Amino acid sequence: QDSTNIGWVFWPAIQAAPCFIHKKLTGENVPALIPAAIDQDPYWRVTRDIAQKLGYYKPAQIHCRFLPGLGSGGKMSASLPETSIFTMDQPDAVKKKIWNAFTGGKGTAAEQRKEGADPDVCSIFQYYFFLFEEDTAKLVERERKCRGGEMLCGECKKDIAEKLNVFLGQHQERREKAKDI
C-alpha cells in the first residue's frame, strides 16, 4: 500500500513547536530547553537538524524518566487503559487499577515476608518515588522495609490508591472551576 498516516508528518511538527514559539510571538530568538521523555528523542533530533537552517538556535533537551504504567513494564498508554491512571478516573476505577497493578512482590504474603520484594520493578513504588514521598529518608525506609519483607504490597497499594484519589479529586474539582473562567 502506498499510503501513510498523516501523523508521521504532523506529529513531529507539533513536538517541535515549543522550540520555536517564542521567536514567533516576540521576534526574539532565544535558546530553548525542552524536557521530554526518552521516547520523544527522535523528534528532538529532527528538530535540532533543521533549527539552524530555519534561523533558530538548536534546542537542548533534558530526558525525563517515565512514570511507568501499572503493568509489568513500559510507560502508561491510552491504548492500555487498565495500566494507566487518567486525570478523570473515578475513585473506584483508580482503586481497581491499583489493586491489579504489577508489583515486585512474591506469590504469597509468607514468601514475601521471608524473601522480601523488589521495589525496582514495582509500579506502585514508583508512585512514591515520583509523586507521593518528598522525604528521601522516608522513601529509603519504605524501600528497606519492602526489600526486607516488613511491608507487603497490599499496604502500599491501599495507601497509593487513597493518595491518588485525593490528588485526582482535587484536580477534578479545579478542572470544573476552571471551566467557568
Which positions does each model-derived feature cover?
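Conserved nucleotide- and phosphate/pyrophosphate-binding catalytic cores
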Residues: I38-I181
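Divalent-metal (Mg2+/Mn2+/Ca2+)-assisted nucleotide/phosphate chemistry catalytic cores
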Residues: Q1-C64
